Amino acid sequence: MSGRILVGTSSWADPGFVKEWYPPKLPAKERLPWYAQRFELVELNSSFYAVPDRNTVHGWVEATPPEFEFDVKVHRALSRHSAPVDSLPPDLRDMAETSGRGRVRLTPELETALAARLIE
């Protein structure tokens, strides 16, 4: 059997971590690099709620070693969970069809565009 098991958590910004695990008074911008020295990966849980912008993602990559991995959780619309239109990237909102309750209906076109955005 071959393969690799990586160990990490679902966030580097969890309030419990901030309070209990990180060094006291460690600035927020230094938490991800500090985390990446101790774990091999992190789950991007925030991507379930809103697609992060490209500059933010590049900043995360730059703050971590080359071998560090990000496990990206797909946006809730792609996993067929209820999603408000404002959780979509602004340029994709006009293509979104909504239910009577203002929730995104995942059309094939939106699914393709949203999936492409996540892997850019």
How would you label these PLM feature ranges?
Residues 1-120:
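Residues lining hydrophobic/aromatic ligand-binding pockets adjacent to catalytic sites
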